[in-house]
């Protein structure tokens, strides 16, 4: 079988990457070792930047029609009782969006299947061979391979790529359960996470309503100790923790799905090994707190997709594909850093010093500037990396066709040159990869060039700088443009 891109892993990262590639008409095949999709809810909500990214492709609204019931409250840092306020970041989604990971995966896979993309399940990878011209995985030949196969990446192991970092010091469980009986302490609606996290009888735990009679239980021992990661999770283990935290009146009904997690923290030194690129948990792992793992993986895919497509479609500038690593590696490193800090602060039972540290952080988070700083990191709205421009705010526009907004103009996954000052600008040499729109807006800006991933590549009025930015990010023009800046 011949294709252009082989994606290994049908989680959110792999599915999002495949979607980006198919928008650019790049042949892609997705391989997944699990025969059926994992039904466990896992991450229970999407961070604001993930919501923005999905909105940039028109993928969010169908999910918003089926969100989980929750109060409109901000995110959290280490479970501290202060809401993270994302409104200063000018986002349409200032609160985490209640969409379980399983539902997101189902939605993305449905989109791929409707576009004719093969998602081949029950295909565990046992052989990866690459040469100067491409990659062979079993009987499939492609130009590149994207390893999106999780923290225990088979591709990474086969290639012998080191995964430096530290082992976990915490052993915890997340489970989708039903309740036979419930006490008054069991929540009926999602609130701020600080109101859900509880400690009792040597355990910490949180119980979040999903839908119907289904709940998401997370628990572990305050000591951090627990069974090995591969140890089976028994009903007795779940029942003991549930009763310890939520009282003897709360009876376990059924354990639907369950898995263990830890605070292990690792990151690849380089996200590329020849013609193999790593994304999502295959490139970095950390304590799964605040939905940052899904956030990172989706944005990895969003950054990589258009660059990989440009490369195989023949218009990528030199070293464009290498900017995937230089832009995404420092962002993930920052997440690993903040989750290590959270792993300490989230556990108040460790010692008095940690309690004092928690109190100090609570005071800091009540300061607007400190809250904005932390909320930008956790939400993914504040992204900083060498050469990476800021995200384009989803502003209201008026075009000749009527009112619209930036995100609605980017569903096709192409670049966008937006002229807001009434001047005519030309992208004729790049018209096969960049859309040109004239509009009016309340924004005080002449014009802006937006990359397919929603980051600003250029803004202002300087025509020569615009042409340089077009060449830098979108390659050489098919025809040399006339100077109509």
What are these regions (language model features)?
Residues 1, 270-271, 409-411, 441:
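Short, flexible hinge/linker loops that cap or flank conserved catalytic cores
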Residues 151-153, 423, 455:
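Short glycine-rich anion-binding loops that position phosphate/pyrophosphate groups of nucleotides
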Residues 433-440:
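Thiol-based oxidoreductase modules, predominantly thioredoxin-like and allied folds used
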